[in-house]
Amino acid sequence: VGFKAGVKDYKLTYYTPDYETKDTDILAAFRVTPQPGVPPEEAGAAVAAESSTGTWTTVWTDGLTSLDRYKGRCYHIESVAGEENQYIAYVAYPLDLFEEGSVTNMFTSIVGNVFGFKALRALRLEDLRIPPAYCKTFQGPPHGIQVERDKLNKYGRPLLGCTIKPKLGLSAKNYGRAVYECLRGGLDFTKDDENVNSQPFMRWRDRFLFCAEAIYKAQDETGEIKGHYLNATAGTCEEMIKRAVFARELGVPIIMHDYLTGGFTANTSLAHYCRDNGLLLHIHRAMHAVIDRQKNHGIHFRVLAKALRMSGGDHIHSGTVVGKLEGERDITLGFVDLLRDDYIEKDRARGIYFSQDWVSLPGVLPVASGGIHVWHMPALTEIFGDDSVLQFGGGTLGHPWGNAPGAVANRVALEACVQARNEGRDLAREGNEIIRRAGKWSPELAAACEVWKEIKFEF
């Protein structure tokens, strides 16, 4: 037999500190917490091995391939400041390990097996560098930011949305009525909640019809283009595409998908359909916190956001920095830039471990949603800038006078903030004053200001 049987240390093969990374490599930064007694080099090498070519023992079929050409390599390890026994392990994967245009295959390879590994107490994928050669195998977002603005004819400000509540239990006609009132009041979009699919109290086809009616009625009355994110997520891909086809036949501008529960394969198929048929695609990240909330185990959301840009979506929820859900400001802004910009420099302060060049893949609009109201408007305008969607669910429907006045209040607040910013005023310092002054001319906004109290915001 021409090979030496038996178990050998991973680090002998997979820890290569002298390796020069190639432009075509996919690079990963893992936060590794080894079990007591396991050296960090062995833990990092184990991750590289188990997520590429390795298995636990030497096998004779290793001799039939060129391991050097195909193996993942742990090329650098650094300890995490302020954390005991935590390391960042950098791993380089040769491009040939991955199927072109498949986020599913990329994740199956990189995170598929290694997270249950005994030598590790915990493991978190913090960032990925997707090389241009691999980016180019993806279609990416169906349309992107510029095309969306042109389709909607809306420029120079963030877009406004609202999730229809209560999310479950309304009949289709009442649901459509709520949509109409919000759009009529001045919002650009309304939204199906992520778990509104096709339940007994409201089947999808009825909802699509009544929402389309609401959209057209509001468009006629306001002279603006309106949309409602019709959730096409379904139990099978075929059913999902059937719903997308019906939305296209109704002539509505945008549909929606839950990309993590629906899965990357379904999402990429839907994104291709949307580009071919002129539909915008709104993406909800339901289930993300299961994967990304633990600080030392799982996958950071910036990786899920990059994966979505590759798989395809025109909007994605990205946290608010100011509302009811968790999100640290610099880190959030880091992945907001990763969604929108063509080229992003490495910036460890914002959690960006690698420079990322998207080579002409269209951008994705970040959606701020969750516990926000009119007093947050100056902060949101300042933090997210024009290329974003600000979504006020309770902050619209919770208005004491109803949905349409709630929508008016949000639109007036937004226009006031954009105007103040364009005049060179400091939204951080004068935010509350700007909202108060706008409220003098808008009873709807004044009423909203009463219900939700001013916030102290430092930014």
Curated annotation (Swiss-Prot):
This is Ribulose bisphosphate carboxylase large chain. The lineage of its organism: Eukaryota, Viridiplantae, Streptophyta, Embryophyta, Tracheophyta. Its cofactor is Mg(2+). Mg(2+) binds at residues 191, 193-194. SUPFAM superfamilies: RuBisCo, C-terminal domain, RuBisCO, large subunit, small (N-terminal) domain. Belongs to the RuBisCO large chain family. Type I subfamily. It comes from Roridula gorgonias (South African fly bush). The keyword Plastid applies. One of its GO terms (molecular function) is ribulose-bisphosphate carboxylase activity. It catalyses: 2 (2R)-3-phosphoglycerate + 2 H(+) = D-ribulose 1,5-bisphosphate + CO2 + H2O; D-ribulose 1,5-bisphosphate + O2 = 2-phosphoglycolate + (2R)-3-phosphoglycerate + 2 H(+).
